[in-house]
């Protein structure tokens, strides 16, 4: 559901650029519905934890902790590994993109950690 939401918002942006405002509106309204579905899934998953990190979720404090864990994984493991693979396969431009994203994810982790620290 989350993936569909992001895809449809991307498709809506493309439709806007191409002048298909009515099509863009269909994509956006459907994306909003997909968001509702994803939120419903997450409400059920509060009992078992964040599917992305395994961390408890539900309260703002727990949600921030899960966000820090997720973003930290992305900047320390996921994107660096993807960048290495891309570079090894000769996709230097994509590797550079992944390295840029790793820096952004590090910033996100820091923002979430700061918010968590300010809660306590």
Each PLM stretch: what is its role?
Residues 2-120:
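Non-heme di-metal
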């Amino acid at each position: 559901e989350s993936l569909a939401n992001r895809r449809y918002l991307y498709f809506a942006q493309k439709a806007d650029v191409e002048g298909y405002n009515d099509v863009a509106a269909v994509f956006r309204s459907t994306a909003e519905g997909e968001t509702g579905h994803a939120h419903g899934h997450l409400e059920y998953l509060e009992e078992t934890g964040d599917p992305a990190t395994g961390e408890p979720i539900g309260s703002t404090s727990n949600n921030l902790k899960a966000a820090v864990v997720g973003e930290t994984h992305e900047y320390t493991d996921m994107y660096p590994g993807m960048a290495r693979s891309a570079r090894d396969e000769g996709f230097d431009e994509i590797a550079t993109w992944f390295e840029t994203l790793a820096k952004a994810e590090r910033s996100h982790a820091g923002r979430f950690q700061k918010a968590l620290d300010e809660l306590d």
